[in-house]
UniProtKB/Swiss-Prot annotation:
<keyword id="KW-0027">Amidation</keyword>
<comment type="similarity">
    <text>Belongs to the pyrokinin family.</text>
</comment>
<feature type="modified residue" description="Leucine amide">
    <location>
        <position position="17"/>
    </location>
</feature>
<protein>
    <recommendedName>
        <fullName>Pyrokinin-5</fullName>
    </recommendedName>
</protein>
<dbReference type="InterPro" id="IPR001484">
    <property type="entry name" value="Pyrokinin_CS"/>
</dbReference>
<dbReference type="GO" id="GO:0007218">
    <property type="term" value="P:neuropeptide signaling pathway"/>
</dbReference>
<dbReference type="GO" id="GO:0005184">
    <property type="term" value="F:neuropeptide hormone activity"/>
</dbReference>
<dbReference type="GO" id="GO:0005576">
    <property type="term" value="C:extracellular region"/>
</dbReference>
<keyword id="KW-0964">Secreted</keyword>
<comment type="function">
    <text>Myoactive.</text>
</comment>
<keyword id="KW-0527">Neuropeptide</keyword>
């Protein structure tokens, strides 16, 4: 969704680089 390397349910997950 915003940042991270993947997305799930419109939410970000992973390193926000």
């Amino acid at each position: 969704g915003s940042g991270g390397s993947g997305e799930a349910n419109g939410m970000w997950f992973g390193p926000r680089l």
